[in-house]
């Protein structure tokens, strides 16, 4: 199996400046955090290792020598520039934000299949690339993310804040009433702001907290949420629905809906709410469930999203589309 993955890191100010910039970033910020695409790729590789699947990473020379081999391109589309034009490609996940970025791709390349992480993303991509899009989520490390004893719980609620677009509006309509309610109940609260924490911080809080408030407008998969679910942490999840609202595309270019912030979910995971209007009522239901230990969020992840299961499904896709 030939896997291809690289983080995009183009030159910015002058040729080859990406190399000193990388060194400086590491010195100032520490090692690169495995979020999003990188975390998904690392989890795929871990899953392949666990099931004993054979693979090579970024073997461009080997692919040139065997142009009929399937190139499994994982990550952003800049990698396609390094893949021979005649090579068949299994493309995804974590690719274009929207196929409008290159609607003619299936005519330019031998794209055997495009992989996206959830059903709503599949429906959106199929509007531009019909007939070649399949759902494949990456797995979660359920041996690493495990529940901690109740005695270790010194935080009641972690607020996971991934609100970026229309920030001021949602601060007034969502964050302020949420924090007021948490304070009114006397709950011990910690906050993780997306982009400002390290994965080990979330891992540690997963051991310490009783519940998480998950605030994200929409998610293609929601790996961070699923990691906490695997750790036995129930979620109070904001799920507004409606349109996909990436401002690069919405509303002038793309109007697609409905979307969701928790594409892998059932009632064992916690409680969802739509916005400020139902926040307080829904949180009351949620917190009663937390205190009664009525949720079993880990069970959903173990049943549907283990590293081994998702890696096996990926191997099956490679076999199916590589022939």
Give the residues covered by each predicted segment:
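N-terminal pre-catalytic "stem/leader" segment of glycosyltransferase-like enzymes
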Residues: 1-77, 312-323
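A charged, aromatic-enriched C-terminal amphipathic alpha-helix characteristic of glycosyltransferases
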Residues: 36-39, 272-319
